[in-house]
Structures are given as structure tokens and as C-alpha cells.
Curated annotation (Swiss-Prot):
GO terms for biological process: endocytosis involved in viral entry into host cell; virion attachment to host cell. This is Major capsid protein L1. The gene is L1. One of its GO terms (molecular function) is structural molecule activity. It comes from Human papillomavirus 24. It is found in: Virion; Host nucleus. Pfam families: Late_protein_L1. Belongs to the papillomaviridae L1 protein family. One of its GO terms (cellular component) is host cell nucleus. Forms an icosahedral capsid with a T=7 symmetry and a 50 nm diameter. The capsid is composed of 72 pentamers linked to each other by disulfide bonds and associated with L2 proteins. Binds to heparan sulfate proteoglycans on cell surface of basal layer keratinocytes to provide initial virion attachment. This binding mediates a conformational change in the virus capsid that facilitates efficient infection. The virion enters the host cell via endocytosis. During virus trafficking, L1 protein dissociates from the viral DNA and the genomic DNA is released to the host nucleus.
Length: 512
């Protein structure tokens, strides 16, 4: 029998129109055939590889922290192309168009030789070697079994390019719920936090991306360079799904590590193995079978295992730096357009991680007068240096001042329209104005003390390595290394042809 029955499944309907859609920059930006080469000076930085060095009072920073495991975030300031006096004024119409920069190529130069740098802690929480144990050790021999331990960090090469700062992620302490037990010694809840990666922020060296200051209160579980820091890792998932794609045009990375040694922590385990818990036999013998009375294994040892990582071989065969990268299509909607005339380059490279050891004689006299070596008469210092050089290929692009284009730019960043001076120009006021002679006297009205408000920098609270390229642009691409590479790969190099000359042969005389 044929009867009507209710539908058992859900019906999916299309979204109601209109649907908001973000256009790609390629849909409304017109690219010209004018290219510029931009380059920076040799960028150098020197400091201590593990911590900041202050004076005796702790008020003056004498030596900054400069580590090979830090992020270097360059904020490149580009000139305003709308202020350029172009030789060909037919390139764009200033009444209907505006000019912007498009990044087409980049080369991040690194100086200094390859080298491996070590890090460590003089009081490292390492109780026992669990890779090759000699005897079963159930507990620490004293209340403090920390050791002086060092290791080489995870090897990492990475750079991220965008017109907005790179977004990082790390784990942080989260707030407890109102009804949770907040007894001392309980493990806190943790949450994933997004933040801007700034110049000097530590990268992950093999111990995770978390706030070690708040989550490791023993101050002995990691090395000195990160024990009081927050290690960040770029949030590639968030940047790849960004609706505008400003934080990451493209990136390149190479990471490698392996576990070199295997240790166990000291201290009380916060989470007992379920086999130890009195739970009416629920977990009996699920994880281990108890040892007999009188055996050393009767008191089970600590289970807080961890490795010390190693970055392994550093080789010039796998370098991301000192080579050009060309941008044809970005991963997001922004295909290399440098909004607000700026570019952010986030770099991590610890393949040039050599830490200099500098020894200084502390006594009066010369080193040549020493008869016997005495270690107490020498003071040892450590320094780390870094060397960078950045080159860019910029393409001149123009934006039509149409309603739909301006609407999207206004929704994305309204300050861009203010820089382009697109506001309505009001009619001039009455030309006759009042001017007081003795404006500072008590007899006249108080002058306006409110200074005109300057445009606020949205990235003022953050720390970057500012590089001014406003006077470092050139049209002579063939005069620079990256420019010649760009001309060659784009097929714009003029091939010189050899001139051939026809030589007329002389007539041969007949013998008579």
C-alpha cells in the first residue's frame, strides 16, 4: 500500500544570496611591467646566547640576548609608490587609480660559517639514564640530583613572508572552572594561545611550544635560553585559512632532530600509574605486575621519561638561505601585495649557531709573562653573532578606485584609504580668520593645547627589526645579483649577437 510518510533525513539547502565573498588581489589589481630592486645593508647583531646581561643593580641592559634559536622578524618599510615621479606618466591615472607594490622575488642572505651551538643548564633535572641503566633506581639519592647537562637543539631553517606579522601559537596556563579543586600541586589546565611572533621570541628547540615560565616552575627542566621564555611555533593552519592571506604569502621550512639521550625526571610523579591506585582492583595488573617483597623493584621508579634532542648534521647541501625564491601564486587571497607599503619577513636559522668563547686575563701585566696556567686568572665570556642581508624584487601594480574594490579594502583595512587621501574635500571656509597678537598673555583666550593626533601604528606594541628601504630602490636590475637572476629566469635578458662581416675574395691573376 502506498502511503505518505515523514522524511527521515535532513534536507540541506544552499545558502541564501547574496553570499559575502572576498576577492583575490589578482581579480582587481593590474600589474605593470615596471620592476624595482630593493636591498638592505649588512644587518648585524651581537649578544649573549643564553640570557640578557645587566649591570650589578639590574637596571641597565649591558648585553642583549642574541641566540641562534630566536626568531628574527624584519619589518621592511617601502616608499609610497604614489609619490614617485615616474618618467612615463601614462602608467596610471592618479584620479582613478592608486599604486601599490607587489613582491615577486626575495633572497635572504646569511653570513657567517655553518656551526652547531649547544645549550644546557648547570642544574638540569636529570636523575637517571634510562637508555642503558646499570641498576634499578627507585628514587633520588638526595633531595637535589640536578646535573650540569648540555645538548644541541633541534635543527630548524624557516622563513615566512607576508605584509602582516606572522601568527604564532603556544600552550599557556588556562583558568580553572569555578567548581574545580585548586589544591597546591595540582596540574593546571592548559590552552592553546595565538600571539604575534616578535623579534627575539624563542623558537621550538625540541621541548615544545609552551610558556616555560608558568608551566615549569622548577626552573630546571629545560636549557637556560628558554627556561624563563615562551617558545612559539608559527600557526600555519590559522594563516593558511586566513580570509585575506596577509600574514603568509608563502613560507619555506626545514626541521630535523633525533633523540640522542633518554633520561628520567626527578621529583614526585603528579599522575600515578593506574596500577598503583587503590581502585577495587579495576586497574589491577593492567600496566605492570607488582614485584615481590624484598625486591628493589617493589618501590616502582619514576615514569617521567624525556629525551634530549639533537639537530644532527649541519650541511650546506640543504640550505634555504642565500638563494632566490620567486612568488608566482600565493597560498591565500593576497598574491604578494604589500599593503601599507611594508613587508614582514620572519626568519629562524640555527645552522649558523656557533657561540664564541672569549677569554680575558684578569691580572695586571701581559699574558706573555705568565709562567704557570691558573684558571682563576682568566674570565670566560660567550657571544653569538648573526649576519643578514635582504634583497627584493618589487613589481609596480595599480588599483582602480571602483566602488566594489574600495568596499573590500575598507572592510579589510580602513587606514589604507586614509593614506590614499580619498576623503571628501569640503568647500573652503571664510578666508577671513581672527589672529591674536599676544596669544600667550592672560588677556587673550587660551591657545589650543591639543596637538593634532598622529596616525597610530597598529604594530607599535610589538618588537620588530625595522629596516628602512624607502631610499634603497633601483630600476637598474642588471646591476644587482638578485636582479640579474630575475631577468634571466623571466627571459628578459638581451642576448648579444655576434656581428659577422662578409670579406670579399680577391680575384686571382692568370698566368701569362
Amino acid at each position: 500500500m502506498s502511503v505518505w510518510l515523514p522524511a527521515s533525513g535532513k534536507v540541506y539547502l544552499p545558502p541564501s544570496t547574496p553570499v559575502a565573498k572576498v576577492q583575490s588581489t589578482d581579480e582587481y589589481i593590474q600589474r605593470t611591467n615596471i620592476f624595482y630592486h630593493a636591498y638592505s645593508d649588512r644587518l648585524l647583531t651581537v649578544g649573549h646566547p643564553y640570557f640578557n646581561v645587566y649591570n650589578n643593580d639590574g637596571t641597565v641592559l649591558e648585553v642583549p640576548k642574541v641566540s641562534g634559536n630566536q626568531h628574527r622578524v624584519f619589518r621592511l618599510k617601502l616608499p609610497d609608490p604614489n609619490r614617485f615621479a615616474l618618467a612615463d606618466m601614462s602608467v596610471y591615472n592618479p584620479e582613478k587609480e592608486r599604486l601599490v607594490w607587489g613582491c615577486r622575488g626575495v633572497e635572504i642572505g646569511r653570513g657567517q660559517p655553518l656551526g652547531v651551538g649547544t645549550s644546557g643548564h648547570p642544574l638540569f633535572n636529570k636523575v637517571n639514564d634510562t637508555e642503558n641503566p646499570v641498576s634499578y633506581r627507585t628514587q633520588a639519592s638526595s633531595t637535589d640530583d640536578r646535573q650540569n647537562t648540555s645538548f644541541d637543539p633541534k635543527q630548524i631553517q624557516m622563513f615566512i613572508i607576508g605584509c602582516a606579522p606572522c601568527i604564532g601559537e603556544h600552550w599557556e596556563v588556562a583558568e580553572r572552572c569555578a567548581g574545580d579543586n585548586n589544591d597546591a600541586g595540582r596540574c593546571p589546565p592548559i590552552k592553546l594561545v595565538n600571539s604575534v611572533i616578535q623579534d627575539g621570541d624563542m623558537a621550538d628547540i625540541g621541548y615544545g611550544n609552551l610558556n616555560f615560565r608558568t608551566l615549569q616552575q622548577s626552573r630546571s627542566d629545560v636549557s637556560l635560553d628558554i627556561v624563563n621564555e615562551t617558545c612559539k611555533y608559527p600557526d600555519f593552519l590559522k594563516m593558511q585559512n586566513d580570509v585575506y592571506g596577509d600574514s603568509c604569502f608563502f613560507f619555506a621550512r626545514r626541521e630535523q632532530c633525533y633523540a640522542r639521550h633518554f633520561f628520567v625526571r626527578g621529583g614526585k610523579p603528579g599522575d600515578d600509574i593506574p596500577g598503583e591506585q587503590i581502585d577495587a582492583g579495576t586497574y589491577k595488573n593492567d600496566f605492570y605486575i607488582p614485584a615481590a617483597t624484598g625486591q628493589t623493584q617493589k618501590n616502582i621508579g619514576n615514569s617521567m621519561y624525556f629525551p634530549t634532542v639533537s639537530g644532527s648534521l649541519v650541511s650546506s647541501d640543504a640550505q634555504l638561505f642565500n638563494r632566490p625564491f620567486w612568488l608566482q601564486r600565493a597560498q591565500g587571497h593576497n598574491n604578494g601585495i604589500c599593503w601599507a607599503n611594508q613587508l614582514f619577513i620572519t626568519v629562524v636559522d640555527n645552522t649558523r649557531n656557533t657561540n664564541f668563547s672569549i677569554s680575558v686575563y684578569t691580572e695586571n701585566g701581559k699574558v706573555t709573562d705568565i709562567n704557570e696556567y691558573d684558571a682563576n686568572k682568566f674570565r670566560e665570556y660567550q657571544r653569538h653573532v648573526e649576519e643578514y642581508e635582504i634583497s627584493l624584487i618589487l613589481q609596480l601594480c595599480k588599483i582602480p578606485l571602483k566602488a566594489d574594490v574600495l568596499a573590500q579594502i575598507n572592510a579589510m583595512n580602513p587606514s589604507l584609504l586614509e593614506e590614499w587621501q580619498l576623503g571628501f574635500v569640503p568647500a573652503p571656509d571664510n578666508p577671513l580668520q581672527s589672529t591674536y597678537r599676544y596669544i600667550e598673555s592672560l588677556a587673550t583666550p587660551c591657545p589650543d593645547k591639543v596637538a593634532p593626533k598622529e596616525r597610530e601604528d597598529p604594530y607599535a606594541p610589538y618588537t620588530f627589526w625595522n629596516v628602512d628601504l624607502s631610499e634603497r630602490l633601483s630600476l637598474e636590475l642588471d646591476q644587482y645579483s638578485l636582479g640579474r637572476k630575475f631577468l634571466f629566469q623571466a627571459g628578459l635578458v638581451q642576448k648579444t649577437s655576434k656581428k659577422t662581416s662578409n670579406v670579399s675574395k680577391g680575384t686571382k691573376r692568370k698566368r701569362t
